[in-house]
C-alpha cells in the first residue's frame, strides 16, 4: 500500500538487543533509587560499570543508541509530565447510602437480582484519599495513573514509585500476565499537622485536609518532592486482568498480600445485612483508632462471578455501595466568642473552644455567622456546647448542653467598634443583620483579607503569598509604617522593604497570633529574612510571582479587586463584555445591568466601587506598574466562538481542569455555563462524584460528557462531542 512503513533490516543480534534492554532497565532503576528515593542499592563503582557496559554495547551497535537510552539522558532530571492515559478497564464511582433504609433497599435489590441465596458481603473502610490504578505486566509495575474521569487518568508512575509500600515487582506465585490494581493513596493523620506547619513556616498555603495533602503530594512535578511526603496506599480492587482468575474478592485480597501489595487491615466478610450493620456500627464508634481518614464503609458482593451477573450502571457497580457516616458531633467548652473582620468589612462572631478532635482533625474555632445566630442558638460564653464538623466543612456550633451550666456563663455582647481599627460598626444598609466596618481603606484586617484573597488561585494566583505574608505586610510589629497601606503598592514591593519586617505569625482561622507549644508565648517572626538578615527563598519567589501576576487576564484582575458581589463568574462576564477596566468604569449602570451574567446587584456594586477615589488610585498605580488592564482581543477582532449558543453544566471534580478553568474554557468559546440542568441544557460535563446533576441529565436524556468528551467538545465542537457522549440509561 502507498505510504506504508516497512520495517528496516537490522544487523543487531537478538541477544545484543536483549542485553541492551536489561542494562537500560537496570540503570534506570538505579538512577531512580539514587536521585528520587535517595536509597541506592549499588555502589557508584558498580553503577559506573553498568553504564560503561551499555555505552560499549551502543558503540558496537550504534542503532541501539536511541534518544531514550540512559546514555543520552541527563541523570537526576526526573519530572512527571502528567500525560493522559487510558485505563484498560473503567474505574467506576460508588452509589451512596446515608441511612439504614438506603442500605436495606440496596441489599434487597442484590437479593432479588443475584439469582441465588449463596453469597456474602465484604465490608471494608472507605479510605478518604486519592484513587489510583496500578498496572503490572508480568509482575512488573509499568504504569500508575490517577482515576481521572474513570476512563482517562494522569500518568503519575515516577511519583507512585516513591511510595515504599508499592512494590516495583510482585513476588510469590500465580503472577498474572497483566493486572490492574485499584487502591487509595492517603496521608496519615499523625503526619498531616506536621506537614502543614512546615508549609506555613515556608510561606506556602497549608492543605485543608489529609485527602488534599495526599493529592497535592502525589501530583508534584518533581518526584523527589513526593518522596519526602509520608504517603501510604491501601489496595481495594482489581481491574483488567489476563492469566488471573479467582472466585471471591476476599480471596483476591489474600493473594494480593502474598504479592506484596498493601491491602486493608479493616475488612470483614459477613453473611448478611445484620453483619454489615455490626461492621458499620463498630467503626462508627472506633473511627479514630484508624491511621487514615475514613469516608464511610464500602459494602461489596464478595463473589466475583455474581458481581459480573449484577453488572454496573454507567457510573457505579450494582454490586457495591458506600455507607456514609453522619457528620460527627462532640462536646467541648466554649471559651470565648470573638469577632473577625472579613475583606468586605463584614464583622462575624466566631467561637473559640477548648481544642477537640472531630472528623479527624483538631478544632479550636467554629463559625457563629452573626449576632442573631448567637441569640438563636442560645449559647453563652462558658457553656459546654455541641460541635459538628463533616470533612473539610467549617466547624459549626449546634447549641449548648443546658443541663451542664453552673451559673458562671455569660452572654455575648457584639462590640460597637471594629476590633482591629476602632471604627464604629454599622449595617451596610437599613435592615441588614450583619454589621460592617466602614473603614475599608485603612482597616488592617480588611486589607489583610483582601490581599490574601487577591493572591489566591481564583484571583492573581500569587504563590508564596500566604496568610502570614499578608498579615506581615499590613500590620507588622516592625517597622511602624506598614509596607502596604492598600493594594495600590503591591506591585512596587522590593526585597529591601521586605527584609526588616517583623510580625506575629497569625492563625488563618482566627486571625489571632499563634503560640509556641512549649512556652505559650505568641509567635513572632522575621517573615522574609533568615537569621543572617538575608532574603528567604520564599520572599524572592513571592516577588517573582507578584511580577508574573501583572499578566493575568482581566477577569482575574477584577476578581482580585474585591468588588462586592463580583466573584469569578461575574468578573468573567464583565471582562467578556467590556474587555478593559476603563470601559467597565465608563459604562453606565444600565449598560452593566443588561450585560449577560451581571444583573442589577452586581451593576450597582461595580458603580459604587469605582465611585471611591482611592479605588481609582489603586487602578492608576497598577497601570503605572505595568499590570494588564485589558484583554488582548477587542470585541471587533474576537476569535471564533465555536460553542456559541450552547448551554453547558459542569459537575463533579475534573482531573485536568479546575471548575473555574473549565468554565473559562467554555465561555471563551462562546458557551453559556449554568448551574442547573434542564431540557435546554446542551451538554453536562461530569467529573468525579457528579451527584444529582448527572442523574437529572440522564433522566432528561441530556448528552453527558466525561473529561475525554469534554476535550472533544473544546477541540472539535458539539457535533463531535455528541458522538462520544455517554450512553443514557433506558
Curated annotation (Swiss-Prot):
Name of one Pfam family that matches: DNA_ligase_OB
EC number: 6.5.1.2
GO biological process, one term: DNA repair
Catalysed transformations (reactions): NAD(+) + (deoxyribonucleotide)n-3'-hydroxyl + 5'-phospho-(deoxyribonucleotide)m = (deoxyribonucleotide)n+m + AMP + beta-nicotinamide D-nucleotide
GO molecular function: DNA ligase (NAD+) activity; metal ion binding
Domain BRCT span(s) in chain numbering: 638-727
Binding-site residues for Zn(2+), renumbered to this chain: 418, 421, 437, 443
InterPro entries associated with the record: BRCT_dom (IPR001357), BRCT_dom_sf (IPR036420), DisA/LigA_HHH (IPR041663), DNA_ligase (IPR001679), DNA_ligase_AS (IPR018239), DNA_ligase_CS (IPR033136), DNAligase_adenylation (IPR013839), DNAligase_N (IPR013840)
Positions annotated to bind NAD(+): 44-48, 93-94, 124, 147, 184, 300, 324
EC category name: ligase
UniProt cofactor(s): Mg(2+); Mn(2+)
Transmembrane parts of this sequence: none
Keywords: DNA damage, DNA repair, DNA replication, Ligase, Magnesium, Manganese, Metal-binding, NAD, Zinc
GO cellular component entries: cytosol
Ranges for region Disordered: 1-23
Function of the protein: DNA ligase that catalyzes the formation of phosphodiester linkages between 5'-phosphoryl and 3'-hydroxyl groups in double-stranded DNA using NAD as a coenzyme and as the energy source for the reaction. It is essential for DNA replication and repair of damaged DNA.
Family affiliation: Belongs to the NAD-dependent DNA ligase family. LigA subfamily.
Designated name of the protein: DNA ligase
Record organism: Streptomyces avermitilis (strain ATCC 31267 / DSM 46492 / JCM 5070 / NBRC 14893 / NCIMB 12804 / NRRL 8165 / MA-4680)
Name of the encoding gene: ligA
Amino acid at each position: 500500500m502507498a505510504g506504508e512503513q516497512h520495517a528496516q533490516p537490522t544487523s543487531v543480534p537478538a541477544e545484543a538487543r536483549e542485553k541492551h534492554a536489561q542494562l537500560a532497565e537496570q540503570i534506570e532503576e538505579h538512577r531512580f533509587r539514587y536521585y528520587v528515593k535517595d536509597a541506592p542499592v549499588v555502589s557508584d563503582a558498580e553503577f559506573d560499570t553498568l553504564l560503561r557496559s551499555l555505552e560499549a554495547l551502543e558503540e558496537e551497535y550504534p542503532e541501539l543508541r536511541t534518544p531514550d537510552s540512559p546514555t543520552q539522558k541527563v541523570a537526576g532530571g526526573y519530572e512527571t509530565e502528567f500525560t493522559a492515559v487510558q485505563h484498560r478497564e473503567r474505574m467506576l464511582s460508588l452509589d451512596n447510602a446515608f441511612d439504614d433504609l438506603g442500605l436495606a433497599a440496596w441489599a434487597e435489590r442484590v437479593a432479588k437480582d443475584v439469582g441465588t441465596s449463596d453469597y456474602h458481603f465484604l465490608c471494608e473502610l472507605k479510605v478518604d484519599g486519592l484513587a489510583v490504578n496500578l498496572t503490572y505486566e508480568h509482575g512488573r509495575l509499568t504504569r500508575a495513573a490517577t482515576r481521572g474521569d474513570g476512563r482517562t487518568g494522569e500518568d503519575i508512575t515516577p511519583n507512585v514509585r516513591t511510595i515504599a509500600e508499592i512494590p516495583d515487582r510482585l513476588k510469590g506465585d500465580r503472577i498474572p500476565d497483566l493486572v490492574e490494581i485499584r487502591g487509595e493513596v492517603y496521608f496519615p493523620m499523625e503526619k498531616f499537622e506536621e506537614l502543614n506547619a512546615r508549609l506555613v513556616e515556608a510561606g506556602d498555603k497549608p492543605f485543608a485536609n489529609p485527602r488534599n495533602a495526599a493529592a497535592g503530594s502525589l501530583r508534584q512535578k518533581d518526584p523527589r518532592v513526593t518522596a519526602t511526603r509520608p504517603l501510604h496506599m491501601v489496595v481495594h480492587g482489581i481491574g483488567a486482568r489476563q492469566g488471573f482468575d479467582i472466585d471471591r474478592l476476599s480471596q483476591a485480597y489474600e493473594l494480593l498480600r502474598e504479592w506484596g501489595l498493601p491491602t486493608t487491615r479493616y475488612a470483614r466478610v459477613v453473611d448478611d445485612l445484620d453483619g454489615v450493620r455490626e461492621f458499620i456500627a463498630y467503626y462508627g464508634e472506633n473511627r479514630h483508632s484508624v491511621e487514615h481518614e475514613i469516608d464511610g464503609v464500602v459494602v461489596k458482593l464478595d463473589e466475583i462471578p455474581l458481581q459480573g451477573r449484577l453488572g454496573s450502571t454507567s457510573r457505579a457497580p450494582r454490586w457495591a455501595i458506600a455507607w456514609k457516616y453522619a457528620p460527627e458531633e462532640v462536646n467541648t467548652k466554649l471559651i470565648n466568642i470573638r469577632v473577625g473582620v472579613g475583606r468586605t468589612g463584614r464583622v462575624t462572631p466566631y467561637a473559640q473552644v477548648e481544642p477537640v478532635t472531630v472528623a479527624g482533625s483538631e478544632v479550636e474555632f467554629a463559625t457563629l455567622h452573626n449576632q442573631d445566630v448567637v441569640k438563636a442558638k442560645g449559647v453563652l460564653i462558658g457553656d459546654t456546647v455541641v460541635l459538628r464538623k463533616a470533612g473539610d466543612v467549617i466547624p459549626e456550633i449546634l447549641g449548648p448542653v443546658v443541663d451542664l451550666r453552673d451559673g458562671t456563663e455569660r452572654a455575648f455582647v457584639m462590640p460597637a467598634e471594629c476590633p482591629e481599627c476602632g471604627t464604629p460598626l454599622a449595617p451596610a444598609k437599613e435592615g441588614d443583620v450583619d454589621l460592617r466596618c466602614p473603614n475599608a481603606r485603612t482597616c488592617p484586617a480588611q486589607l489583610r483579607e483582601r490581599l490574601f484573597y487577591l493572591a489566591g488561585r481564583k484571583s492573581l494566583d500569587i504563590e508564596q503569598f500566604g496568610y502570614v505574608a499578608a498579615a506581615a505586610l499590613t500590620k507588622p510589629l516592625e517597622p511602624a509604617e506598614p509596607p502596604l497601606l492598600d493594594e495600590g503598592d503591591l506591585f512596587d514591593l522590593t526585597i529591601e522593604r521586605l527584609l526588616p519586617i517583623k510580625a506575629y505569625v497569625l492563625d488563618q482561622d482566627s486571625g489571632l497570633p499563634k503560640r509556641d507549644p512549649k512556652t505559650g508565648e505568641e509567635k513572632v517572626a522575621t517573615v522574609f529574612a533568615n537569621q543572617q538578615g538575608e532574603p528567604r527563598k520564599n520572599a524572592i519567589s513571592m516577588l517573582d510571582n507578584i511580577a508574573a501576576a501583572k499578566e493575568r487576564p482581566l477577569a482575574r484582575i477584577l476578581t482580585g479587586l474585591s468588588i462586592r458581589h463580583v466573584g469569578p463568574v461575574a468578573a468573567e462576564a464583565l471582562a467578556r463584555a467590556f474587555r478593559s477596566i476603563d470601559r467597565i468604569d465608563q459604562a453606565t449602570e444600565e449598560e452593566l445591568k443588561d450585560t449577560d451574567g451581571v444583573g442589577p446587584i452586581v451593576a450597582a456594586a461595580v458603580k459604587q466601587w469605582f465611585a471611591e477615589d482611592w479605588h481609582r488610585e489603586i487602578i492608576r498605580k497598577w497601570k503605572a506598574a505595568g499590570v494588564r488592564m485589558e484583554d488582548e482581543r477587542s470585541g471587533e477582532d474576537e476569535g471564533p466562538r465555536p460553542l456559541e449558543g450552547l448551554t453547558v453544566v459542569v459537575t463533579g471534580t475534573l482531573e485536568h481542569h479546575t471548575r473555574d478553568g473549565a468554565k473559562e474554557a467554555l465561555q471563551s468559546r462562546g458557551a453559556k455555563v449554568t448551574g442547573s440542568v434542564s431540557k435546554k441544557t446542551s451538554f453536562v460535563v461530569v467529573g468525579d462524584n457528579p451527584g444529582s446533576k448527572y442523574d437529572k441529565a440522564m433522566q432528561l436524556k441530556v448528552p453527558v460528557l466525561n473529561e475525554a468528551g469534554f476535550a472533544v467538545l473544546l477541540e472539535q465542537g458539539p457535533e463531535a462531542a455528541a458522538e462520544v457522549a455517554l450512553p443514557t440509561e433506558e
